[in-house]
């Protein structure tokens, strides 16, 4: 049996950008350009570039800049999502970040603001990331 313990997982970052608009919590989504799930709405995310990104936070900031045209707001590390079945390409881990930002920051095309209460099916485990970010924001609002 081959030794598979040294195989590297797919390493990515995903960013949950939340905002209040018309009294409802919204999340910023992008349409995926590549497989898997090409054409689906998803959280802004991408690979960690080992030779370019100093750390996962820098990777998240780069992804927001490149894919959404955003200068990184204050980003808080949310959680790490990992496993053999979260990505059809193979074993992967994603470091998720979140931020609560003013809606005017998210007026950049190609972002789509979607009410959290009306989210479509999302690829990977992006729904779990949104749920975790919403829980974090609600928890913080109770002691702020």
Language model features by range: what are they?
Residues 15, 77, 97-99:
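A structural signal for short, well-ordered beta-strand segments
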Residues 24-72, 82, 144:
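Conserved Nudix-box catalytic region and its N-terminal flanking loop in Nudix hydrolases
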């Amino acid at each position: 049996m081959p030794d598979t313990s040294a195989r590297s997982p797919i390493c990515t970052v995903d960013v949950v950008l939340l905002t209040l608009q018309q009294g409802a919590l919204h999340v910023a989504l992008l349409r995926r350009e590549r497989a898997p799930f090409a054409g689906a709405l998803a959280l802004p995310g991408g690979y960690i570039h080992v030779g370019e990104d100093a750390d996962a936070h820098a990777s998240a900031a780069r992804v927001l800049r490149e894919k959404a045209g955003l200068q990184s707001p204050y980003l808080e590390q949310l959680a790490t999502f990992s496993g053999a079945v979260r990505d059809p390409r193979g074993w992967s881990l994603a470091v998720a970040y979140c931020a609560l930002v003013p809606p005017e920051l998210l007026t950049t095309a190609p972002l789509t603001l979607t009410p959290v209460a009306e989210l479509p099916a999302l690829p990977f485990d992006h729904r779990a990331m949104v749920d975790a970010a919403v829980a974090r924001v609600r928890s913080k609002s109770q002691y702020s």
